[in-house]
Amino acid sequence: KPKGRGKQMMPTPVKEAAEKHGLPVYQPRRVRDAEAIEEIRKMEPDVIVVVAFGQIIPKEILDMPKYGCINVHASLLPAYRGAAPIQWAVMNGDKVSGVTIMKMDEGLDTGDMLTKVEVPLAADETGGSLFDKLAAAGAKLLVETLPKLEKGEVTPEKQPEISTTEYARMIKKEDGKIDWTKSAVEIERQIRAMSPWPSAFTKVNGKNLKIWDAKVIAMFGGDLFSKIPGQNPTKSAGKVWVADETGLHVKTG
């Protein structure tokens, strides 16, 4: 896939590892194409493992493997079904996240759960650091789960129904834009969740200023603005009150 400023085509880590071990690599442009489906059928897979794959797997492929298609999902299902479970876990201030290995069906992360592992979040957890934690935990869980699946030692568990509002929708660049009328706690979580991508930002003189780190502070032991006669806290949100070597102190909602 394209990497770097020059957008040069580079092999993915999965492809590099496969080639290092002499394993064949097949990279269809669209997995739903008849040619791709037939090529996978010829492989006669016992199991298909899907991790962060950006295409919908057709039913013809889901039904092929003896042990099914399994997905390594970066949340404790049914929480955070969808494309961006990691960022939303940080954004919502969760204390615990985790990985679920599930048997895939035609729904969006709705298949039966096979195994799970919990991963605690640090107070300064970012989207990037949690990604690394869950990647390591998921790889370990997958290696443990596959032999159990083959031996019939895994009992599939159906997922309870959840509201569609609980889905972890895809993150867009605009989700990094800071609304200073929100609370300091919400903004601090947003900044951590959006690191390293798409990154939190604000507008300064018409230009985007990326913000990588922040912490919540209480000025003068309380809400400074409630002590200023005639001060409107909402209108003053986003105003810089202190700028020194430690950074900027900005009023929030």
Where are these regions (language model features)?
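One-carbon transfer enzymes
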Residues: K1-P198
